[in-house]
Amino acid sequence: MVRREQSNAERGLVLRTERCSIHDGHGIRTVVFLKGCPLNCWWCSTPESQSFEIEHAEGNTYGTYMTVEEVMKEIRKDSAFYFHSGGGMTLSGGEILAQPDFARSILRVCRNECISTAIETSLCSSWENAASILPYVNTAFVDFKLVDNALHRKYCGIGNRLIHQNLIK
């Protein structure tokens, strides 16, 4: 029997999860780092998140495919901390909008379970992708890398016009 692949809304490429974070939004949070980013910033704090593929280097594996339920199982582990600290879950990356259906599914389940949601994004995606997740987001951190388009292209690998247009919207 051939196993059918799950849809993008139910399965995505996750770099890692970090529990009990206090740096990615208010209160104590679980941060889910998605893998894959259209940018290639020279100063990226998580360069292992840039590739859209699972990578193996120096005995480490970077990335694993997870279902929404598997991700939620990790998020729920710290739910008592969220409610007592005003925290919740933060989606980060990579670029979360590179996996918009998966990101939206995670955010939707969190909102349905009254878990506060935050995202970290460069907005380097279509506006439709961004707009589709915003109803499920409590806090958005937008990392606008460089104002100058030529410098953005030099240091991030692509220009910033799309990002700038999304910020205006």
Residue positions per predicted region:
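N-terminal [4Fe-4S]-dependent radical SAM core
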Residues: 1-66, 77-83
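Conserved AdoMet/S-adenosylmethionine-binding subsite of the radical SAM
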Residues: 72, 76-169
